[in-house]
Amino acid sequence: MRILAAGSLRQPFTLWQQALIQQYQLQVEIEFGPAGLLCQRIEQGEKVDLFASANDVHPRSLQARYPHIQLVPFATNRLCLITKKSVITHHDENWLTLLMSPHLRLGVSTPKADPCGDYTLALFSNIEKRHMGYGSKLKEKAMAIVGGPDSITIPTGRNTAEWLFEQNYADLFIGYASNHQSLRQHSDICVLDIPDEYNVRANYTLAAFTAEALRLVDSLLCLTCGQKYLRDCGFLPANHT
């Protein structure tokens, strides 16, 4: 079985893949990448059994083209602001003051190619509604440096934000809140929550192209086994409000 999955799913899906091989003797090949770029490959004719997207937009666009596929929401996520602890120089600094600092470089994912980039633009719009002029300044300031067809390639196994900071590409990065889990081991990294009134809900959705893939989803990923991997890696349930 062949699966294309959003890069943010690498940790839980790798655990799921290992369980499928060890417990069920199922051979599963998973390739990770920005969901928008993966969707383009499917639209161009690439064969796949299952597509796991970080949004519901790409699966719906595929269903419009291939009406037989089944869509299954399976997890949600939120955005957060990631930075180096050394960047926070004053106790009264919060996520918004850091974002608006003219001295700090803000890295983001590439919109359209990577859903995280689209969610980031939605975050900027939410900020603009509450602080006139802030959102437009952030759109000008943000550097789309990952997730695009010609973007920087993050080494496999490295956290995106941590690697960007290490290589001096950015001082701040807007990523998924599930990063909390993988960044705990980095004592020099700080993850700041974004309040609900500003934040954006990321709706992770599966597109099953074959009956076998749908059975696999129904029997494993969306029940206790697969959901435990998702929860352990910082994802929220599909019905989370």
UniProtKB/Swiss-Prot annotation:
Pfam families: SBP_bac_11
GO biological process terms held by the UniProt record: molybdate ion transport
GO molecular function per UniProt: molybdate ion binding
Listed NCBIfam families: PRK03537.1-4
Protein name from the UniProt record: Uncharacterized protein PM1146
Organism field: Pasteurella multocida (strain Pm70)
